[in-house]
Amino acid sequence: MNTIISSKNNPIVKRAAALKEKKGRREYGAFLAEGEKLTAECLRSSLQAERAYVSENYAGKRAEEIFALLEKRGLGEDKITYLSESAFSFVSEEKTPQGVMLEVKIPVNVPRAPEGDCLILDGI
């Protein structure tokens, strides 16, 4: 049986809620992908998924697909957090949340040195 977090004061819930704000996203270096479609797209991409948040009654159209993608990406039960409906609504920015969201690490864009010939124009 999975533990369901219902307290809005739980550190995990507070962290997820903080990701709604720019300050929280900068502090944790992550953002929330909310909803079935966006969650599935992030799991299929090269983005680094940190944790999944699932509402206690989640049974969306793509639930089976989402859980299969989570498993494929190595996000086991230790990286899936089950929230009560009220805690999930607290974290969600949607009026009618779909019941699943993904915490994704913000990619760091490292500038690459140009390969081959390069022309740099400055002050033109």
Question: Can you describe what each PLM-predicted range is?
Answer:
Residues 1-69:
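Boundary-proximal intrinsically disordered activation/regulatory segments immediately upstream
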Residues 4-5, 55, 76, 110-112:
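Short, solvent-exposed coil/turn linker segments
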Residues 22-23, 72, 91-94, 109-113:
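Short secondary-structure boundary/capping segments
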Residues 25-26, 47, 73-76, 95-97:
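A generic structural signal for short, non-catalytic loop/turn and secondary-structure boundary residues
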Residues 29-30, 50-52, 78-81, 98-102, ...:
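Structural motif
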Residues 37, 44, 75, 81, ...:
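RNA substrate-binding interface of SAM-dependent RNA methyltransferases
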Residues 66-93:
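A glycine-rich helix N-cap at a beta->alpha junction
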Residues 86-91, 99-111:
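Short, charged beta->alpha transition segments
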